[in-house]
Amino acid sequence: MTNVVVVGSQWGDEGKGKIVDWLSERADIVVRFQGGHNAGHTLVIDGVSYKLSLLPSGVVRPGKLAVIGNGVVIDPHALLAEIDKLAAQGVKVTPENLRIADNATLILSLHRELDGIREDAASNSGTKIGTTRRGIGPAYEDKVGRRAIRVMDLADLDTLPAKVDRLLTHHNALRRGLGEAEISHQAIMDELSSVAERVLPFMDTIWLLLDRERRKGARILFEGAQGTLLDIDHGTYPFVTSSNTVAGQAAAGSGMGPGSLGYILGITKAYTTRVGEGPFPTELDDEIGRFLGERGHEFGTVTGRKRRCGWFDAALVRQSVAANGITGIALTKLDVLDGLDELKICVGYTLDGQQIDHLPASQAQQASAKPVYITLEGWKESTVGARSWADLPAQAIKYVRQVEELIGAPVALLSTSPERDDTILVTDPFED
């Protein structure tokens, strides 16, 4: 038995929700370890859809403990709204099934406002990143700047005013420079006071809790958000998120040692998508790109934004396999490729007349790199709902085997529809 870390191996939206749901049924604890409510997914359980952005997937399953680790930035208003929405669907979220790290950073209204102000200014200058405007980046900035308000601060009203003053010294200077009105000390105190009573019962010392449960033999599932190519260090900077999204962050963002992580499962879409700005070597602006978007229902769970679509990029996923130490992948949305006459896979790039096997870190070089493709025959048969290799067309199996060879990692699970049971299990990550 081992613990499992789930990470996205592309630019997010790989289908982590279904796979995490499938795995969470067998886990005892599900841990979020980075990001915020800027990425979401939909779980379908007994025909009921649950849309989650901040809460770990385990929260909708009876008998599971959901944990929000110290690596997550938490908007308390979004947290409570999500809890209330689940309550309306008959799911009770209580301190019995949800624990939140006492040292996790809070996202406040001033973070959301700053995020929006910056994006508006960047849109006018052509330097937009394409954030969700939810305050994630500004909150991480305050965390690194050692001026953040953390969950534990809600319980210490004696020292909170001085911390708010320190926070506002920074933010009001920024706002003056941007031509925006300053924020009053009382406004932030009122905002924090309005959520403290409901948030504090969930607070816990997470590293201690997880260490205790690990020693008892609990199965722990670490649930990543976004994808490797959006990692602040390893992604297509600056068109990235504001946290580390790679598997190593599961340790740092939860307070557990790296030796506790176990099986690293990379969720990998059978083609490539991206939301927002940034380089995308295999992007298709043609009829095939539109086909992938429509067949794959490529719209964001949180923002509703249309996703850009393109061919599978084995060179990028190969990089993700290395950066995460991926043990095996879950290949999703294979069924979306049904009916295409031929399929292309990117195996590298040409840059300045030279062929290279990885995407450089340089923004200018990323923009100039051109994909090098191999072409495979497609298949006309349907793979929708396939639950065994015998249900798959020969060409679909050939495509999967080619992906494995090119990325240097085996397929552990294969998903053939949004339904959780339409999954071909090759290797059980918890038993590896």
Swiss-Prot record:
Binding site for GTP: 12-18, 40-42, 307, 333-335, 415-417
GO biological process, one term: 'de novo' AMP biosynthetic process
Reaction catalysis annotation: IMP + L-aspartate + GTP = N(6)-(1,2-dicarboxyethyl)-AMP + GDP + phosphate + 2 H(+)
Key word tRNA-binding present: no
Cofactor note: Binds 1 Mg(2+) ion per subunit.
Binding site for Mg(2+): D13, G40
Intracellular or extracellular location(s): Cytoplasm
Top EC class for this record: ligase
Enzyme Commission number(s) of this protein: 6.3.4.4
Keyword vocabulary terms for this entry: Cytoplasm, GTP-binding, Ligase, Magnesium, Metal-binding, Nucleotide-binding, Purine biosynthesis
Domain of life (superkingdom): Bacteria
Biological or metabolic pathway of the protein: Purine metabolism; AMP biosynthesis via de novo pathway; AMP from IMP: step 1/2
Gene Ontology annotations for the cellular component aspect, listed alphabetically: cytoplasm
Subunit structure: Homodimer.
PANTHER family: ADENYLOSUCCINATE SYNTHETASE
Family: Belongs to the adenylosuccinate synthetase family.
Protein name: Adenylosuccinate synthetase
